[in-house]
Amino acid sequence: MSDTPLIQPANVGEGVYEEGREGYGHIKSYVRRAGRMSSAQENYYAEMMPKIGLVYASQPIDLAAFFGRNNPKVLEIGTGMGETTAKIADANRDIDYLGVEVHVPGVGALCKQIAERELTNLRICQHDAVEVVRDMLPEDSLDGVHVFFPDPWHKARHNKRRLIQSPFVALLASRLKPGGYFHCATDWEEYAHQMLEVLSGEPTLVNSSEGFAPRPDYRPLTKFENRGLRLGHGVWDVIFRKKQLA
C-alpha cells in the first residue's frame, strides 16, 4: 500500500483527519447528521443489532463464519434509510449482503426492514466504511461492492471528501475476488464522470460497458430517483469488474 491517504485530508475547518491502522488515515467522507430514531426504529434497533450487527474491530473477519454459510458476499456502502438495500437482499436471498451505514436513524430503519421481511442474508455494520474495508475485510473476499448515491460534496473545495477516490477504489478492488463487480450510481453528473475516470484508472478493474452502464435489474429505482427521472434528471451507473487472474 502506498503512503497516499485513502481519502485526501481536507483544509482547515472542513473535517478532522484521522490516523488509521499502520498510519494510513483518511478524512471522513460524511458528516454525522442530527436525527433521532422513531420509537419503532429504536425498538427494532435494540432487538436486531445484537443479532445481525457487525461490531467494528481492527482485525480481519471470516465472512462465511459471520453469515453462517459460504454464499456470495456483497458489500453495500451507505444504506441510507435501508429500503433499497432491503429490496435487493429480499430479491436475492442466495447472496449475503453487508451494509455499512453510520447514521443511526438509517440503521434503525434498516433493522425494521430486516425484521419485517425476515431477511437472514443482510447484516449491518454501523461504522466508517473506509475503516471497515481497510481493517476487517480480507483480500479477495467480496463478490460485489455497491456504492449507490454517495454524498457528491458538490462544492469544489469539498470534492476531496468524496468517497470514490483512487486510493479507496484500489483498496476496495483488493477486497474483490477476480471477476467480482464494483457498482456505483449517482444523480450528480460531474461526480459520475469522476467515478468513471477513477475506476478506469484502477489497473485491476475493467469496465463492463463502453462508458456508463444501463441500470441493472438488481438495482431498484428509489422514490427520489423516480421523481428525478420524471423531472428529466439523469442517473448514471458505473459498473466495473475485477480482472481475472492470468
From Swiss-Prot:
GO terms for molecular function: tRNA (guanine(46)-N7)-methyltransferase activity. GO terms for cellular component: tRNA methyltransferase complex. It holds the Pfam family Methyltransf_4. The keyword Transferase applies. Keywords: Methyltransferase, S-adenosyl-L-methionine, Transferase, tRNA processing. PROSITE patterns: SAM_MT_TRMB. The keyword S-adenosyl-L-methionine applies. Its EC number is 2.1.1.33. It is an enzyme of class 2 (transferase). Pathway: tRNA modification; N(7)-methylguanine-tRNA biosynthesis. It catalyses: guanosine(46) in tRNA + S-adenosyl-L-methionine = N(7)-methylguanosine(46) in tRNA + S-adenosyl-L-homocysteine. The active site is at residue 151. Substrate binds at residues 155, 187, 222-225. Residues 157-162 are annotated as: Interaction with RNA. InterPro entries: SAM-dependent_MTases_sf, tRNA_(Gua-N-7)_MeTrfase_Trmb, tRNA_methyltr_TrmB_bact. S-adenosyl-L-methionine binds at residues 76, 101, 128, 151. Belongs to the class I-like SAM-binding methyltransferase superfamily. TrmB family. NCBIfam families: tRNA (guanosine(46)-N7)-methyltransferase TrmB. Catalyzes the formation of N(7)-methylguanine at position 46 (m7G46) in tRNA. HAMAP family: tRNA_methyltr_TrmB. This is tRNA (guanine-N(7)-)-methyltransferase. The gene is trmB.
